[in-house]
UniProtKB/Swiss-Prot annotation:
UniProt keyword Cell wall biogenesis/degradation present: no
Organism for this UniProt entry: Listeria welshimeri serovar 6b (strain ATCC 35897 / DSM 20650 / CCUG 15529 / CIP 8149 / NCTC 11857 / SLCC 5334 / V8)
InterPro entries: Ribosomal_bL28/bL31-like_sf (IPR034704), Ribosomal_bL31 (IPR002150), Ribosomal_bL31_B (IPR027493), Ribosomal_bL31_sf (IPR042105)
Protein name in the entry: Large ribosomal subunit protein bL31B
GO terms, biological process: translation
Pfam families registered for this protein in UniProt: Ribosomal_L31
Single GO term (MF): structural constituent of ribosome
């Protein structure tokens, strides 16, 4: 491998700005801010808006969009009743 072309991979602390949840992970992203972690070491600090602690998919507070099909929209538009219900 060539030297000097690969980013430095290191441990960093990510903090979710909406919930103040912090976790330690590896990254090549750099930061001028640092934070002292639970193990006593100091790590670069990266702020994120959404993490697994605040994302609706992981928290179970997601909304399911109900998309009507083309046939349903046609029937609603022209006031037709469900063809399967009439049978």
């Amino acid at each position: 491998m060539k030297t000097g072309i690969h980013p430095e991979y290191r441990q960093v602390v990510f903090v979710d700005t909406s919930t103040d949840f912090k976790f330690l992970s590896g990254s090549t992203k750099s930061s001028s801010e640092t934070i002292k972690w639970e193990d006593g070491n100091e790590y670069p600090l990266l702020r994120v808006e959404i993490s697994s602690d605040s994302h609706p998919f992981y928290t179970g507070k997601q909304k399911h969009a109900t998309a009507d099909g083309r046939v349903d929209r046609f029937n609603k538009k022209y006031g037709l009743k469900d063809a399967n219900a009439a049978k």
